[in-house]
Amino acid sequence: MAKANEIKRGMAISYNNKLLLVKDIDIQAPSARGASTLYKMRFTDIRTGQKVEERFKGDDILDTINLTRRAVSFSYIDGDEYVFMDNEDYTPYTFKKDQIEEELLFIPEEGLAGMQVLTMDGQVLALELPQTVDMEIIETVPGIKGASASARTKPATLPTGLVIQVPEYLSTGDKIRIHIAERRYMGRAD
């Protein structure tokens, strides 16, 4: 059991007879005095894969579920199934393409360090990605010299097909760091 204001992204809760995995949290502070802060949470129903949105007050009590997290790395594709290998005991974890469609936009061909599989009682529930990923821009309009002073952006295509907004001074071939949850440009990659 935890209060709504203690819930973090990646946690799992049981609510309305559903197992829900927290994907995103928006905190809405009210302008009126005495009103409590609202937490708008976006979930994925672990059993059905549906997206669910709920609002909670900061002091609402939610039933949290303990999940097991296992570090994995991408192994291979078998038809429409993606296989990830446990980094310690080499157990394979299989996901159908439609289960991890969003996550695949952030996994480059060479793989991504920091991925975890979430399991509960031996059942595979979800694939969790790290906060950021470094990728190379494969297509964008040419960079404009001297554009670093303006805050204007342009679309850039990445190797996985993901398109995000980047500053105008970047060009094709530049490596950038992307915040996965917010799908936004963070800066140049090291």
From Swiss-Prot:
NCBIfam families: PRK00529.1, PRK04542.1, yeiP
Full protein name: Elongation factor P-like protein
HAMAP family for this protein: EFP
Any GO BP: peptide biosynthetic process
Entry similarity comment: Belongs to the elongation factor P family.
GO CC, one annotated term: cytoplasm
UniProt-listed Gene3D superfamilies: 2.30.30.30, Nucleic acid-binding proteins
Gene Ontology molecular function, alphabetical: translation elongation factor activity
Pfam families per the UniProt record, alphabetical: EFP, EFP_N, Elong-fact-P_C
Top-rank taxon, per record: Bacteria
Signal peptide coordinates: none
Lineage, uppermost ranks: Bacteria, Pseudomonadati, Pseudomonadota, Gammaproteobacteria, Enterobacterales
